[in-house]
Amino acid sequence: MPPYVFIRNDRVTEQPTSSLKEEDKGGRQGPAVPGWRHKHVMPTFTDEAISYIQRNKQSPFFVYMPLNAPHTPHAPGDAFVGKSKLDIYGDFMVEVDHHIGRVMDELNRLKLSDNTLVIVTSDNGPETNMYPRRSKFGHDSSSHFLGAKRDNWEGGHRVPFIARWPGVIAPGSKCDTPFSLVDMMATFAEIMSVELPEDQGVDSVSILPLMQGKNGDYRGSHAIIHHSSSGRFAIRRGDWKLLLHAGSGGNGYGAGKRSSRYKGTIEQKSFKTANRQLYNMRTDPDETTNLIEKRPEVVSELTALAGEYVRKGRSTPGPRQKTVLQSWPQLDWLPKKPTNFRPEKP
């Protein structure tokens, strides 16, 4: 989205004195620095990451490298056009793999690989354009899971998480325990022996034991909270996942998305009108059977737990955080409080 300009340390690197017309698929017109080309963004990000690693190779470092792909505008470099044999979106993803490889190669060259934790993951599930792409190419970005980016269904939240850490993470190992990217903050803090302040990382639990191969309930009795693009909540603990709303909580799957290209969306299922949804994610990871009426005790328990988290402003032990409830329409599932109710201060 415009303005098209790089930012370094809270300052633009150059004034966007030019104007860019729609150049690539999904691009938007707007102010830009002279000579801006979308296809140069990903190589530039990678160059910056590699340069930072080179400058800090003698001391511990942390690099967060969020790439512009596969977001719009879809603008793969010239060398990658046609590489996926699918479409420009696929070509863009091939380029992502290339630039991750560049970082890995540099770590190897600097002899840092054996002492560096590398994580490759995604912030959400695939875009809804995966449905026509699945029909056209047979490629299913969300696998068999229901929903997409923005949704509280599994397809909206389950993402790849690939981690390499020689000496800690066993090569070729697999973790079957669900965790959240929110947990990264507590994980990195534990790795670095840093104690987080009581008001930071209030929903974060370290997954270091999982990285060490200790599969199990790393969260104990603490649940994971999901949040959709419309602000709707879901809560997950153990085998159970409770969506505190009807439908996806995010994307609309109306008449325009009921064709065979969108097979699997909620409006084609019998429980589409339920105002809450309960799934056993161990036996029904595809979220096909709503157990909201069959397991009321689970619904009550998880609803109460979610309410406790909201009122405390956190899902981990610690002091209560400031929470504003009165103007939060997505909390319509929360038990009503007296009109003079005021949330407790931290």
Language-model features, listed with the residues they occupy:
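C-terminal cap/loop subdomain of S1 sulfatases and analogous C-terminal strand-loop tails that border
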Residues: 128-134, 138-152, 169-173, 177, ...
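The substrate-binding groove and active-site-proximal loops of carbohydrate-active enzymes
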Residues: 31-43, 82-95
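Short glycine/proline-rich turn/loop motifs
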Residues: 24-34, 78-83, 164-168, 282-287
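Formylglycine-dependent
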Residues: 1-58, 67-76, 273-274
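Histidine-centered active-site microenvironments of extracellular/periplasmic hydrolases
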Residues: 72-76, 82-88, 92, 109-168, ...
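Long, internal low-complexity/basic segments
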Residues: 184, 237, 249, 259-277, ...
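Short, solvent-exposed turn/loop segments enriched in Gly/Ser/Thr/Pro and often Arg
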Residues: 63-73, 120-128, 203-204, 226-230, ...
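Loop/turn elements at helix/coil->beta-strand transitions in domains of secreted/extracellular proteins
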Residues: 57-63, 112-118, 157-159, 219-221, ...
